[in-house]
Design a protein with these regions (language model features):
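Secretory targeting and sorting signals
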Residues: 1-25
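Short, high-confidence coil segments that cap the C-terminus of an alpha-helix
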Residues: 62, 84-85, 186
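Exported/periplasmic ABC-transporter solute-binding proteins
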Residues: 3, 21-45, 50-54, 73, ...
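Signal peptide-proximal N-terminal region
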Residues: 54-66
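Short, glycine-/small- and polar/acidic-enriched structural segments
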Residues: 109-118
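Extracytoplasmic metal-acquisition and chelation regions
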Residues: 23-26, 80-84, 114
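Pocket-flanking alpha-helical
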Residues: 73-104, 128
């Protein structure tokens, strides 16, 4: 009987060893599996976030940062509809409030940078734009739609200046506005300071005092139901930390 028991125990041990080998042979394998961190961010953040994403990947082996850049209102809508996201960075507090009101934030949002509007015109300024009042003249003006942060800021400066614009189109992201200016489809567009900076010689920027009436504050948070909450928080920490501020400042963003 003892021999039978020893034989059964030995057989069980062999079976367990074989099962472990068949499953990869190591408890470390799941941790080494590739992970995708999904970051939803306002279109105006594309360049600095891509740089920070590369840095994050270099510090986290087997992690890929996948970005979705669009208008903040569009991104909130996608998250509300179930799109998988680990981190959300908005170009204003209004759209972040939509996320928190729906209970879709994992942690309290943190304000991490600011941005203001600037007039963008094609190189050479063919329409002769000089200030905000010039945008009410006979020209093709393109702005952001009111539900987008840059559109809400446009309405604020319009009201502050006592003007009424008649844009030929209202776009869903500040990038779309800039593209219409650089392509020559528009004589002028209201975009962020950072967008004028990144466009280089393709556009000229015109500052106006009313821009200070609409300083956009950018908050960031991890998203409730995230598949990677710890990694998401580490990315938020990178953005809100010293290195994040340094990178953002390099693209023309202001302090929070």
């Amino acid at each position: 009987m003892k021999t039978l028991l020893r034989s059964a125990a030995a057989a069980a041990a062999i079976a367990l060893t074989a099962a472990a080998c068949g499953s990869g042979g190591s408890a470390e394998d799941p941790a080494a599996a590739p992970v995708t961190l999904r970051v939803f961010a306002a279109a105006s953040l594309q360049e600095p976030f891509e740089e920070l994403g590369q840095q994050f990947e270099s510090e986290h082996e087997d992690v890929t940062v996948e970005f979705s850049f669009a208008g903040s209102s569009t991104l909130v809508e996608q998250i509300q509809q179930g799109a998988p996201a680990d981190v959300f960075a908005s170009a204003d507090t209004k759209n972040m409030d939509k996320l928190t009101d729906a209970g879709l934030e994992e942690t309290d949002p943190v304000d991490f940078t600011t941005n203001t509007l600037r007039i963008a015109v094609p190189a050479g300024n063919p329409a002769g734009v000089t200030d905000l009042a010039s945008l009410t003249g006979d020209l093709n003006l393109v702005v952001c739609a009111p539900e987008v942060p840059c559109g809400a800021a446009t309405e604020t400066v319009e009201e502050a200046a006592g003007l009424e614009f008649a844009p030929v189109s209202e776009e869903q992201s500040v990038t779309d506005v800039l593209n219409k200016v650089t392509s020559g489809e528009a004589d002028a567009g209201l975009v962020y300071v950072t967008d004028v900076e990144k466009a280089g010689d393709a556009v000229e920027g015109i500052d106006f005092p009313e821009a200070q009436e609409a300083v956009n504050t950018y908050p960031i948070t991890t998203v409730d139901g995230s598949a990677n909450p710890q990694l998401g928080q580490e990315f938020v920490d990178l953005v809100t930390g010293e290195e994040g501020h340094k990178v953002l400042a390099g693209y023309g963003f202001g302090g929070a």
